[in-house]
Amino acid sequence: MNSAPKLNTFQHLIGEHQTFLEAKRIAKQFSLSELPVLITGKIGTGKNHFAHAIHLESSRSNEPFISVNCSTHSEETLIHELFGPNGNTGVFQKAVRGTLFLDDVWRMPASVQAQLLKALDSDTEKPRMICASADRSVEHTFRQDLFYRLNILTLTLPELSERKSDIPLLTQHFLSNSGQQLLIDPSVFPVLEKHAFEGNVRELKNAADYMAAVSSGGTIQPYDLPPYIRGTIDGKTSKKKAKLLTLMEKAEFLFILETIKVLNEKGEPASRRIISEHSKNTQTSLTPQQVRSRLDYLEKKDYVTKSRGRAGTKITFEGLSFIETLKNQMI
C-alpha cells in the first residue's frame, strides 16, 4: 500500500506530443466526475502518475489517495490489505472519502474480485475507484459483472514510441532533477530516438540517471549513453567506409578521433591547433591545416560536429563506432 505518493499534478506530467496532450485533456475531464476510471497502457507509461493527478484535480484532493498493486500480494494478503481482518478496516474503508487506486487490477484473484464487487454494491459510502492495467491478455479471466463496474471512464496512455518527439524534453527534465548542472549534446537525441524503449518513460528515466552518474564533464555525450542503447546502432556503414581508406589515413583518423574523445571527456576544447599540438610527440604528426582537412572529412561522414568558440569539435556516436572499426582493421 502507498498512501503518500510523490506529488503528481497534471503540471508534473511532461510532454508536448499531441497524443500525450489528448490523454491529459481526457484525464482532466475525468477528474470532474465521481465515476470509476480504468487506465490502460504499457509498463512505464505513467499510469500511477495519471491516477494521482486525477485525484489531485478532483473534489477529493484533500482526502487520502491509497495505491494497492494487485499483482504483488498473495490472495490472503490482498484481502487483508483491502478489507482488513474483520472486513471493514482495510484500505477500502480508509480511502472511503478519497481515491483507491488498484494497479494491475486484472491480476486480482477471483475471491478478492467477489469481495470487491460486494463492497461496491453496498449502500455505504465508497472511495473513488481508479484502476490500471498493463496486461489486457488476462482481462478475459476477470469476472464480467465487476469488469463493467470498473470500466466506465477509460483512459489509454500512449507509448513512448508513439511520441518520440518528447524524448529530448523528457531527457532534459530527468537530468535537471539529478541535482547536477548538466547539458546534453544534441547528437545524443538521435541515438535515443532510434531506441525501442519497451520500458517507455520509466526506461528513459533510467537511461538519464545512468548518463548523469557516468558523465565526467558538464555536457552529456553519446559515449555517456547506457551500453545497451549504444549497441542498438548499426556500425556496418562505418566498416564499409573504413575499407576505402589507406593505412596512413586510418592511423590519422584514429588518432584525431581518439584525441577528440579524450578532450571531450575532460571537458576541454578540441580545436585543430590543440589536436595538432597533441600529434607532435606521436608517429602521426599533423599540422593545423592537415587537421582541418581531416576534420572536414570526418564532419561530412557525421563522425564529428564542429562548433565555433570554446566548444570546439565533438565526437558523435557514429564517430565512436568508427574508432572501433578502425582499431579492428588495423590489428
Curated annotation (Swiss-Prot):
GO biological process: one example: positive regulation of DNA-templated transcription
A single GO cellular-component term on record: protein-DNA complex
Domain Sigma-54 factor interaction: 12-213
Induction and repression of expression: 8-fold induction by growth at 15 degrees Celsius.
Keyword Nucleotide-binding: yes
Record keywords: ATP-binding, Nucleotide-binding, Two-component regulatory system
PROSITE patterns: SIGMA54_INTERACT_4
Positions annotated to bind ATP: 95-104
Disruption phenotype: Cells grow much more slowly at 15 degrees Celsius.
Nucleotide-binding listed as a keyword: yes
Top-rank lineage group of the source organism: Bacteria
One Pfam match: Sigma54_activat
Gene Ontology molecular function terms on file: ATP binding; ATP hydrolysis activity; cis-regulatory region sequence-specific DNA binding; DNA-binding transcription activator activity
Biological role stated in the UniProt entry: May play a role in cold adaptation.
Protein name: Putative sigma L-dependent transcriptional regulator YplP
Species: Bacillus subtilis (strain 168)
Gene that encodes it: yplP
